[in-house]
Amino acid sequence: MIESKNQSFFPNRFDCVVVGAGHAGSEAAYISSKGGARTLLITMNLDTIGQMSCNPAIGGIAKGHMVREVDALGGIMGKMIDNTGIQFKMLNTSKGPSVWAPRAQAEKKEYQLKVKHTLEAEKNLSIRQDTVEELIIENDQVIGVRTGRGFEIFTDHVILTTGTFLSSLVHIGTYQNENGRMCEPTVKGLSKSLAKYNLKLGRLKTGTPPRIHKNSVDLSVLTIQEGDSNPSPFSFSTDKITRKQIPCFITYTNAETHKLIHENLNLSPMYSGQIQSTGPRYCPSIEDKVVRFADRERHQVFLEPEGYETSEIYLNGVSTSLPEEVQWKLVRSLKGLENAEIVRPGYAIEYDYVDPTELKPTLETKKIKGLYHAGQINGTTGYEEAAAQGLVAAYSVLHSLRNLTPLLFKRSESYIGVLIDDLVHKGVEDPYRMFTSRAEHRLLLRQDNADQRLMKYGYDLGLVDQKSYDCMKEKYERVNSVREKIYQIPLKPSDKFQNLLDQKGITNYKFGMKLDSFLKRPEIKIKDIEFMIPEVSSWSDLEKSILEMEIKYEGYIKRELETIQWKNKYLDLAIPEDINYEMIAGLKKEAIQKLKSHKPMTLEKASQISGVDPSDVDLILYHIKGKKKQEVEIF
C-alpha cells in the first residue's frame, strides 16, 4: 500500500479523473472538460501528451472514417492532424465511396505539442505529472485513485487509458526491459489493483519498426509517393489544407532480406518462445510476414518522414524485435538503404489488457461503477480506435453527471458503434483493428457524411457550437434541395451538352431523360454537369461529393436502409440445432469453426461471436429462410 500524504495544498476532488494522456486519454480529457466536468488528467510525463508512439500518421482505411466521426462529435483528433499534417491522401478512390478513407502523415512533434497546448487551454481541465498505482473502491463503486507519490484524488468517475504501460515489457532480441515505451517506465501497481477486483486481465503484444536517418538513405533510387494535389481535411471545421506537403518513398524487401530473417528467426522473441503474448493479426512483424507468406518474393516498405524539422524516417512495414545487429543488416539489405543508419531500433512490447467483455457499451466496467476503460487497455490497437473509445467514455461520464440516459452508439450509424459493439460483445483474441469490412452498413457510414450522422449528439452536449451545427444543417439542406432539382431536370440539346457527350464518347442517351439518371453513369461526375446546375459551382469539394454519391448510389442506400429493418426483425430468429454450417455457401472457415464451437441459439448471439462477421450472419439468415437475400421479407 502506498502511504497517503497531506495534500490540503492542492485540489483533490474532481468530477472525472483521466489516467494516461495518449490518444484515448487526450480525447477523453478534452471531451469531459469541454462538456463542463471538472476534470483531472494524470500522465507520467507532460512531454509525451498526445505522443505518436508508432507510425507518424493519422487515418487510413476505416480509421479515417473514425477520425471524422470523432470530429463530428466534438473531438480534437481531426483538427490536430489538419494543423500538423505534412502529406494528405484520400485512399481507395479507385473503389466504391464507402471505402474512401483520408490519411495524413504528421509532423510528429508538432502534433504532440498541438494536442498538449489544446488541452492546456481548457479551463475545466487540470493536468498533473504522476502515475496512478491503485484504485480506491468502496462497495463496488470507484471513489478515487492513489498516485505513485502517495496522493489520493477523489472522484466518482475514472477513465483508464493506460496504453501499453500496464506491467509492460520491451523486447529486442534477448534484451528485455520493463518499459511502457522504449526508455519509459512501466506501471505495475494498477494491474494488481484491477486484478484485485476480479477484472479479467490478459497479455497482448505489439511492435514498432526501426527509425533511420534521412541523410543515410539514397532517395534517388526509391519510388516517390506524393500526396494529393487538393487534399481533403479531416475536420469539418477546416476549410482547406494549405500546409506544404512532402513526399514519402517506397522500397521492397528482397531475397537477401528474407534469407537474413530466416537465418536469425531463433533470435526473434516471437519465435524463440521469449514472447508468449498474441500480436496484431493485421499488422504483423516483418518476421511474421516472411514466414507466413513464404511464397512472396518481396514485401513493400514505406519510408515515412517524421516531420519538417527532423531527419528521422519511419520504416512502415518493418516492425521487428530482432537483435539490433540483425536489424542493421536487415535494413541495409533494402534498395536505397545500403548505408542506412538506425537512430532508434525496432522493438516488441508485451502489456496487460482487460477483457473488454467486462465492459458495458458505455465502456463502464460491469463490476465497478464509475470505472471506464478506453484504448489499448481494451485490447485495441491504433490511435484512431483509442481516440474513439476515449470520446465514448467521456460522453458516458457526461451523461452520468447530468443524469441523462446513456448514449449507445449503433452499428448502423457509426464505425464507433461497430467498434464498441465488437469489443463489449465479442472481446478480442488479438489486438483489434478497425476495417471497413467489419461494418455491415458501410455504404451508410461514408467518411463524407459523419457530421450528418453524428453531430447532433455533440451539439446536444454542448461539445459542438451553434455555428458549426447550423453550417452542417444548411449544407445538407442545400444538398437535398439540389438533389430534388436534379430529379426534375430533363436532358436538352445544347452545345455544352454535346461537347460533354463527345468528350465522354457517349452515344446511348435520350433527350428528355432526367439528369439524375445521366449522373448515375459511371463516367459522369458532378463536375461534368455543373453547367446544368450552376449553384453547385461555389460548393466545396466535400458537398459536391456528397451530392454525387447520394444520387449515384441511391438505390444501394435505399436497399441498405431496408436491410437494417429486416435484420432488426430477425435478430431473435432461432438457429436450428441441427444446422450444418459447412453446407452454407460462402461462410468463412473461421466462422464455421467458431459457430460449431459456440453453438449460438439465435442470430443475435451468432453476431456476437469473435470471428463471425456481419456477412456471415447474413448468409446464415438466408440459409434458414431458404431464400436469397432479395427474397427475404422486409416488412
UniProtKB/Swiss-Prot annotation:
Its cofactor is FAD. PANTHER family: GLUCOSE INHIBITED DIVISION PROTEIN A, PROTEIN MTO1 HOMOLOG, MITOCHONDRIAL. Homodimer. Heterotetramer of two MnmE and two MnmG subunits. Belongs to the MnmG family. It comes from the Bacteria. It is found in: Cytoplasm. GO terms for cellular component: cytosol. SMART domains: GIDA_assoc_3 (SM01228). Its main location: cytoplasm. Keywords: Cytoplasm, FAD, Flavoprotein, NAD, tRNA processing. NAD-binding protein involved in the addition of a carboxymethylaminomethyl (cmnm) group at the wobble position (U34) of certain tRNAs, forming tRNA-cmnm(5)s(2)U34. GO terms for biological process: tRNA methylation; tRNA wobble uridine modification. NAD(+) binds at residues 279-293. The keyword Nucleotide-binding does not apply. The gene is mnmG. FAD binds at residues 20-25. SUPFAM superfamilies: FAD/NAD(P)-binding domain (SSF51905). Coiled coil: none annotated. This is tRNA uridine 5-carboxymethylaminomethyl modification enzyme MnmG. GO terms for molecular function: flavin adenine dinucleotide binding. HAMAP family: MnmG_GidA.
